[in-house]
């Protein structure tokens, strides 16, 4: 509870104690002998203690031309109650309204907590070495390439690469992951995480304004400005609703006495009851609070949603499209299969590794990594790269060929075609075929589970787009049980495929695209919902996306769908409940059946119940599993 909330709580307690005393005194007849002005002054004390700020806000807003708001309604209703001699009811209305406001403030604080935890990732300083001493500087002043020192317990201020030291890194604030990650020399590291056990020296790779933490803070700060359709509806509704009910209350106070005759006091009281009931707090508070709670619940599991409009769109998602590399697969080439012909697997791998020893191609690197031994340069010579074919090289004095089918055909080597999914590397020496290696991009751990979860939450179609060969793409799609696959695509082709999928959708259906690369930015922008990888993803992809997975775990997309649907369900419940109760009590108040106490329930009671309902959105810890 904040200092301001504690002060309000004290005002409520003092006012409540005085209210109870006055309530007892009135019912015992103690106040009856006093003149009306003395009673008014006595009841004004607890009223002003608890409600002076409401009167001040209403007066200030009126002076600024903003007349019709909940402060104005409360002021007019309670002044009216004082005017007709209902002093106790006037104090009760203001007291319980402020109880509701305090409760609302507490609820908003709770729902903001996980988001403000994410906001707390901002580092306050960076340590750099000068003349053998550590000097504290502002992260904004650190240039790219500077070596910074991060001690145990300190927050990592800038993105960079570890050049010295080893430690466990707490990434919970960014990714929602409770298990620390190990970082050592050569590892990339992102700002905003907390260094655990060891001192690290890090060479910075980005300025602070371009760092991960700066971008996240910018995204979080902008999230609340992007409203969902239902929020915009409530904003427009409140704009017209409040003036209408105010005019209605005035007419209720004036017209019936003129037509039916009799005193104005009873009808003014009914008009005051009408005003209290009609206060739109339950709607104006609970709807944004529900969406804010949904965004907070998503951030708890490491998913950053950039606005309630995108949270609403996720709830309507029926098609999800994945880029393959880096999203469904690791983007790391591995030698997944060896098919020797007349030699051992070890011999095939050795010759292939030696043959690729002069190449800097990623596939060559994966073969050398699979070999796992130091390359003896003395055994190889005369390497020649043949564009579009492969390499020819002398290995132990024997002419060796490592490459694709074209190379085997060009050298007239009788090879055995390999139909395995992946990139096939053929190996031959002189005119002898030694065999083939299959190099594949491995499927990410949890990718199959992610697809299964998405289908369980009602996503109808899972599609994969890739620039890879048809056979490789089909193999991955079959392994993950995807509904559609489109292969051998250029970046522009991906946009075209998404356009086709969008045109096939019905009203109320939404399409999401999940990607991580710079070339994915146009597709992320074009899709109804763009989902980017926050850890491995490019800055352009994160900027273009509407939702960011802070730890690149696509299993959390299904959890976000559940959170968004629960949020929308609760928001709609609040709207229906608030309008229904208010409509009934408004009618009862207008005909004189409901009194000021029922009016207080219709306002404060409904608001509190709606707020409690909204807070249920935050209870989504089970979705992480």
Feature map (PLM): residue ranges:
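Membrane-embedded alpha-helical bundles of multi-pass transporters
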Residues: 20, 24-35, 55-61, 79-80, ...
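Cytosolic catalytic headpiece
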Residues: 117, 131, 309-529, 562-565, ...
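Juxtamembrane helix-loop transition segments at the membrane interface in multi-pass membrane proteins
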Residues: 59-69, 103-117, 289-308, 615-625
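Residue-level signature of catalytic and energy-coupling elements of molecular machines
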Residues: 58, 86, 107, 126, ...
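Bilayer-spanning, highly hydrophobic alpha-helical transmembrane segments
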Residues: 14-17, 232-261, 270-291, 572-601
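N-terminal membrane topogenic signal
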Residues: 1-14, 241
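Membrane-cytosol interface motif
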Residues: 69-74, 115-130, 299-324
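Actuator/coupling domain of P-type ATPases
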Residues: 19, 23, 42-125, 129, ...
């Amino acid at each position: 509870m904040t200092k301001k909330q504690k002060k309000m709580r004290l005002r409520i307690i003092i006012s409540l104690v005085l209210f109870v005393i006055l309530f007892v005194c009135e019912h015992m007849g103690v106040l009856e002998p006093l003149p009306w002005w003395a009673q008014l002054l006595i009841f004004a004390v607890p009223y002003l203690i608890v409600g002076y700020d409401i009167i001040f806000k209403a007066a200030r807003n009126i002076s600024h031309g903003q007349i019709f708001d909940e402060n104005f309604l409360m002021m007019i209703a309670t002044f009216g109650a004082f005017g007709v001699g209902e002093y106790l009811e006037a104090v009760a209305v203001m007291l319980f309204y402020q109880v509701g406001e305090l409760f609302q403030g507490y609820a908003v604080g709770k729902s903001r907590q996980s988001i403000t935890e994410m906001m707390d990732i901002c580092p306050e300083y960076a340590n750099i070495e000068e003349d053998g001493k550590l000097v504290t500087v502002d992260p904004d002043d650190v240039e790219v390439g500077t070596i910074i020192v991060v001690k145990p317990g300190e927050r990592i201020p800038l993105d960079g690469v570890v050049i010295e030291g080893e430690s466990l890194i707490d990434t919970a604030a960014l990714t929602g992951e409770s298990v620390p990650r190990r970082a050592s020399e050569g590892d990339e590291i992102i700002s905003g995480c907390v260094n655990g056990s060891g001192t690290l020296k890090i060479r910075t790779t980005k300025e602070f304004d371009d760092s991960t933490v700066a971008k996240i803070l910018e995204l979080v700060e902008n999230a609340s400005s992007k409203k969902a359709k239902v929020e915009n509806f409530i904003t427009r509704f409140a704009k017209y609703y409040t003036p209408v009910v105010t005019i209605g209350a005035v007419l209720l106070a004036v017209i019936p006495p003129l037509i039916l005759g009799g005193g104005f006091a009873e009808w003014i009281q009914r008009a005051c009851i009408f005003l209290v009931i009609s206060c739109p707090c339950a709607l104006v508070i609970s709807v944004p609070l529900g969406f804010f709670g949904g965004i907070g619940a998503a951030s708890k599991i490491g998913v950053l949603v950039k606005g309630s409009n995108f949270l609403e769109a996720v709830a309507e998602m029926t098609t999800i499209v994945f880029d393959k590399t880096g999203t469904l697969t690791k983007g790391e080439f591995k030698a997944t299969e060896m098919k020797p012909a007349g030699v051992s697997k070890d011999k095939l791998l050795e010759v292939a590794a030696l043959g690729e020893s002069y190449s800097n191609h990623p596939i060559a690197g994966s073969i050398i990594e699979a070999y796992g031994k130091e390359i003896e340069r003395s055994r190889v010579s005369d390497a020649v790269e043949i564009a579009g074919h492969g390499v020819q090289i002398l290995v132990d004095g024997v002419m060796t060929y490592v490459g694709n089918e074209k190379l085997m055909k060009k050298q007239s080597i009788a090879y055995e075609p390999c139909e395995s999914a992946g990139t096939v590397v053929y190996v031959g020496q002189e005119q002898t075929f030694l065999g083939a290696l299959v190099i594949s991009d491995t499927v990410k751990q949890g990718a199959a589970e992610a697809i299964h979860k998405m289908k369980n939450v009602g996503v109808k179609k899972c599609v994969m787009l890739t620039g890879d060969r048809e056979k490789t793409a089909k193999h991955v799609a079959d392994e993950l049980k995807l509904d559609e696959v489109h292969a051998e695509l250029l970046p522009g082709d991906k946009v075209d495929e998404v356009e086709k999928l969008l045109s096939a959708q019905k009203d109320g259906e939404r399409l999401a695209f999940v990607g991580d690369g710079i070339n994915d930015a146009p597709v992320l922008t074009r899709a109804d919902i763009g989902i980017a990888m926050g850890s491995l993803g490019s800055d352009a992809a994160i900027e273009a996306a509407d939702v960011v997975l802070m730890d690149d775990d696509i299993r959390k997309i299904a959890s976000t769908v559940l959170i968004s649907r629960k949020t929308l369900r609760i928001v709609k419940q609040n709207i229906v409940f608030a309008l229904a109760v208010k409509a009934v009590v408004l009618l009862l108040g207008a005909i004189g059946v409901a009194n000021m106490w029922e009016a207080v329930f219709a306002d404060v009671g409904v608001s509190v119940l709606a707020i409690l309902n909204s807070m249920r959105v935050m209870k989504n810890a089970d979705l992480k599993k």
